[in-house]
C-alpha cells in the first residue's frame, strides 16, 4: 500500500509517489503556494485605496479597460475582481509585515537596482577607427549618435546608439562603472571588451527616489521570499513525514 502524506490546508492525503510526481512537474509548488497565500490573507481586509490602486495597476499592465464594454466578458470580470481583491490583500499583508524594512533595503539597492541611466554606444573591432571617432567627438567635429548609426557593429545602431533606461545591475560591470562615475554628455576614453572597442557617452542619469511604488515592490518581494521559504520547509517536512496536522 502506498505511503500517504497529509497535505496542509486540505483535509486529504496524497501518496508519496503522487506527491513526488506533482513536485517534479512543478504543479505541487504552484498549488501549495496559492493555498498558502489564501490562508495568509483569509483575515486580511484591504482598504478601498489599495483595491483601486491594484485595479489600476492590472488595467495598465494587461489593457483590461476594453473588457468593460463586452457583455460576454461578465465571467472574466467577476474573476478579475476576485483577483484584484486577492492581490490587494497580499499587498496589505506585505506592507503590514515588511514596511519597516523597505526603506533600508531601498537605500542599499538604490545605486545599482533602481537608479536609471541612458547612454550612447559606439563599438566595432577596429581600434584605429574607434580612436579616430573618439577624437572627432571630443573636438565636436561629429557626434556619437551619427557615428553609431553608420559604424557601430551592434543593434544599437538602429537607435542612433542610444540605450536605456537601464539599471546598473543589468549591464556589463565595466560599462556600469563608467556610467556611475561619468558626467552627462561627456565621451569616455575607448575601452576594449570581448574583442571589440567601445565608446560610451552617458546621456542622462535619473536617481531613484523612495516612494510608495518602491515600498510596495520591496514588501511584496519580501513576502514572496517568505512564502517560498515556507514552501520549501513544508515540502521537506512532507517528504520526511514529520507533519502532524
Predicted regions and their residues:
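Peptidyl-prolyl cis-trans isomerase
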Residues: 2-245
